[in-house]
Regions:
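Acidic, metal-coordinating helix/loop segments flanking the phosphotransfer/catalytic sites
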Residues: 29-47
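Binuclear metal-dependent hydrolase catalytic cores
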Residues: 120-293, 298-303, 313-314, 371-405
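C-terminal output helix
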Residues: 105-114
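Charged docking surfaces used in two-component/phosphorelay signaling
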Residues: 14-22
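The feature encodes the CheY-like receiver
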Residues: 13, 55-56, 73, 85, ...
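Cap/insert and terminal regions of metallo-dependent hydrolase folds
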Residues: 298-392
Length: 405
């Protein structure tokens, strides 16, 4: 890649240049933002790395001026500054920066941070794929026995997390092992049944000052998502309350709506499940990830089958790069589980084929289903898709597996 580095500090300029060229990149440097604004349009770099506090024109002004030029719309801009305030981070985003890295420069993590910010990718990682309750034992080793948690990484954005089942403990461990000045994430709760919220207290980043965490979830009529989370942590149930979290924590109740966070858009849809349950569609730069759990798709022969709802759901997930969806039961298991709020293979395959998604990921497995059972369920789903003439790629992701889009 071709980088254009702007900084009036010669030591910082030299270090950034050394790190970037050492990784095989081409680097152009300027000690003045005025000179940079003059030269960048002609040089067309892939990425500009700019300091903030410079004379005549600061880094925010430079970012704003560059973003006003349509021919530079695809160019990445990363702000590199000793200012660690949240205000400045937000201001950089408002001006059009793709990311913000703080000084002093960490030689061990700088290139990783740059890579995450400038690489146009979305990474989906599975931390828990079972439903209802965690299941330990050898029979669950391949797919894992933790309950729902999926993370989505978007370069330059806070981490997006879907549900807080027991799998979030593994995500917590990963975050705590990664050196960072601060950690930010947005957590989206599908609904407040235990297997989707009861591991919130074990997400260690919540306890660290300087971290910023937002928790979104469906409004339950007279129960806010904040109250639902905090109630399970009252003293008779758990020894730590939400008041002891050190991170800056914000709760937000959701209905069917659209949320926009810079380049990321999150749409919501109410699902067929006891209580209020939301499905989510995360879209960014022409790609999308749909997280649809828990959800019951009744058989077409059942009087409760709602063709309008199925079509509406198909429209919601249409063309998704990956559909992560409740496939709790094999078809022969479903008749005794009707009205439990979960779906079976044939209806999930029909939804994926109807919506022409690119990938179907089976999720929220029944706790009684072992690795061998999930293998059979995957085989049945692939056969069902083939019978429908669908080219949808179908997988059953295991804990720790990741997909890059």
């Amino acid at each position: 890649m071709k980088f254009f580095v702007v900084d009036d500090d010669p030591d910082s300029l030299a270090l950034v240049t050394r790190l970037l060229t050492g990784a095989g990149h081409e680097v152009v440097v300027r000690g003045s933002s005025v000179e940079a604004l003059r030269d960048i349009p002609d040089m067309r770099p892939d990425c500009v790395v700019t300091d903030v506090m410079m004379p005549v024109m600061d880094g925010f002004e430079l970012t704003r001026e560059l973003r006003r030029r349509p021919e530079l719309a695809q160019m990445k801009i990363v702000v590199l500054s000793a200012k660690t305030y949240d205000f400045d981070r937000r201001r950089a985003k408002e001006m059009g920066a793709d990311g913000y890295i703080t000084k002093p420069i960490n030689r061990d993590t700088f290139m990783q941070s740059i890579g995450e910010l400038v690489t146009d990718r979305i990474a989906v990682t599975y931390w828990g794929v079972h439903g209802t309750l965690p299941v330990p034992g050898e029979a669950y080793n391949r797919y894992g026995g933790n309950t729902p948690c999926v993370s989505v990484e978007v370069g330059g954005e806070p981490l997006y997390v879907f549900d807080c089942g027991s799998g979030i403990k593994k995500l917590s461990d990963r975050v705590m092992r990664t050196p960072a000045e601060r950690f930010s994430c947005r957590i989206f709760i599908s609904h407040t049944h235990w297997d989707h919220i009861n591991t919130v207290p074990f997400f260690a980043p919540l306890y660290l000052r300087g971290n910023q965490i937002e928790i979104f979830g469906p409004y339950q009529g007279d129960l806010t998502i904040e109250r639902a989370i905090s109630a399970q942590m009252e003293s008779v149930y758990f020894p730590v309350t939400v008041r002891e979290f050190g991170a800056r924590l914000v709760f937000r109740d959701l209905r069917e709506e659209r949320l926009e966070f810079g380049p990321v858009r999150v749409d919501t849809m109410l699902l067929r499940h006891p209580g209020y349950c939301l499905g989510y569609k995360l879209s960014c730069r022409g790609r999308s990830v749909c997280y649809i759990t828990d959800n019951e798709l009744y058989l077409p022969t059942d009087a409760r089958h709602d063709a309008r709802y199925v079509e509406r759901l198909a429209d919601f997930v249409r063309g998704a790069d990956v559909l992560i969806t409740d496939t709790t039961y094999r078809d022969h298991e479903y008749p005794s589980k009707v009205d439990w709020g979960h779906s079976c293979v044939s209806q999930v395959a029909d939804l994926a084929a109807r919506a022409e998604v690119k990938r179907l990921h089976l999720f929220h497995h029944d706790p009684d289903q072992t690795d061998a059972d999930i293998d059979l369920k995957l085989e049945e789903t692939r056969k069902a898709l083939a019978q429908l003439g669908s080219k949808v790629q179908c997988e059953a992701p295991a804990e720790g597996s990741a997909l890059k889009l």
